[in-house]
Amino acid sequence: MAKVIKHEIFYPNPVADVWDYLTVPELMKQWLMPNDFQPVKGHEFKFTAKAMPDFDFDGIFHCKVLEIIPYEKLVYSWDFGPGNGVLNKSEVNWTLTEKNNGTQLLLVHRGFSGSEMLPIFGAMDKGWLGNIHKILKLLNPETDATTTA
């Protein structure tokens, strides 16, 4: 059975401010990792991280922008693995909604199937939760947020 990561968080900030943290490479690097992202449908880009041999991960996430609706939705592929041509394929979906003078952000990451994916699923689930809270702290150093998984 496939596992899905799902987190929702409220930011007391305008949608445009949250959107920037999802689409501006320099801001993305502050809460996620170095990248060559461009907010253009079809753009192929990479996130680079420390290799994790225990997870059979070479340190590179190979991505492609699949859908983009400015200030509303961003979807990209998120493929990773040992770098030998065999990649684990997944998809990251961000949805932003204006709510109560702020932004409701929904993150859904799909594509974790098979028992061999359980360790990476757990690591990614925890990682995404921490990362969306990093955005909150970058936007509002003095504020806390609520999240639901």
What residues fall within each predicted segment?
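Conserved catalytic core of Hanks-type protein kinase domains
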Residues: 21-22, 68
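Intrinsic-disorder/low-complexity, polar/charged segments enriched in Ser/Thr/Lys/Arg/Asp/Glu/Gln
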Residues: 2-8, 44, 60, 73, ...
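Aromatic-glycine hotspot motif
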Residues: 2-9, 15, 52, 66, ...
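Hydrophobic-ligand binding "helix-grip"
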Residues: 33-36, 55-100, 110
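Short, flexible helix/strand-to-coil boundary loops that buttress conserved ligand/catalytic motifs
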Residues: 22, 32, 78, 139
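A conserved amphipathic terminal alpha-helix motif
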Residues: 111-149
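Short beta-edge strand/loop motif at the mouth of beta-sheet-based domains
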Residues: 6, 13, 26-60, 148-149
